[in-house]
């Protein structure tokens, strides 16, 4: 299913999330199972299925990584069950530096400063990747689609690192 069509968007990485939320509420009202309580079993089942599609579409388009994956899947590139690793040497080196910095936080004289520096580093790198991804997803070339898939892989890795950093920060606050 093309969630961009469902929510009446042109396929694009940058979408107005406020408009997305508004269209989500409209679709929810239109397909909500309570609206079909007195209809046939088949119509009620269809309403439940449609509600699930609307919910999944909203969650997909709301999240930038899932949105990019969806755009790539519409172009025949499925990253959902992928085990391909990033082969970009510079990114792998950066990844190792981040991992070492994560390990050093607890022994640091000022753990919060280290955490803040890592959050800033992640944000700067994520911004760089997102700019590349936006340009690559707006292109019609197969090569750019494959490059976009690499950016998504990197963003997924960074999301895991960000979650790990958040867990470390939470543990230090306890």
Curated annotation (Swiss-Prot):
Residue ranges the record marks as coiled coil: none
Pfam families in UniProt: HSCB_C
CDD domains according to UniProt: DnaJ
InterPro entries for this protein: DnaJ_domain, HscB, HscB_C_sf, HscB_oligo_C, J_dom_sf
PROSITE patterns assigned to the protein according to its UniProt record, in alphabetical order: DNAJ_2 (PS50076)
Keywords assigned by UniProt, alphabetized: Chaperone
Taxonomy, superkingdom: Bacteria
Residue span(s) of domain J: 2-74
Record-level GO cellular component terms: iron-sulfur cluster transfer complex
A single GO BP: protein folding
SUPFAM superfamilies xref list: Chaperone J-domain, HSC20 (HSCB), C-terminal oligomerisation domain
GO molecular function annotation: ATPase activator activity; protein-folding chaperone binding
Sequence similarity: Belongs to the HscB family.
Matching PANTHER family: IRON-SULFUR CLUSTER CO-CHAPERONE PROTEIN HSCB
Record NCBIfam families: hscB, PRK05014.1
Role: Co-chaperone involved in the maturation of iron-sulfur cluster-containing proteins. Seems to help targeting proteins to be folded toward HscA.
Quaternary structure annotation from Swiss-Prot or TrEMBL: Interacts with HscA and stimulates its ATPase activity.
Protein name: Co-chaperone protein HscB homolog
Organism encoding this protein: Shewanella sp. (strain MR-4)
Gene that encodes it: hscB
């Amino acid at each position: 299913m093309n969630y961009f069509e469902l929510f009446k968007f042109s396929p694009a990485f940058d979408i107005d999330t406020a408009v997305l939320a508004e269209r989500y509420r409209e679709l929810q009202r239109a397909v909500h199972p309570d609206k079909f309580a007195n209809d046939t079993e088949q119509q009620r089942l269809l309403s439940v299925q449609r509600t699930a599609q609307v919910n999944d579409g909203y969650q997909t388009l709301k999240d930038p990584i899932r949105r990019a994956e969806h755009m790539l899947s519409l172009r025949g590139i499925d990253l959902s069950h992928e085990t391909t690793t990033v082969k970009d040497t510079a990114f792998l080196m950066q990844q190792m530096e981040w991992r070492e910095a994560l390990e050093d936080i607890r022994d640091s004289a000022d753990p919060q400063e280290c955490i803040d520096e890592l959050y800033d580093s992640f944000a700067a790198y994520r911004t760089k990747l997102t700019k590349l991804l936006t340009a690559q997803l707006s292109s019609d070339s197969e090569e750019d689609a494959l490059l976009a898939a690499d950016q998504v892989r990197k963003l997924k890795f960074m999301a895991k690192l960000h979650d790990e950093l958040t867990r470390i920060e939470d543990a230090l606050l306890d």
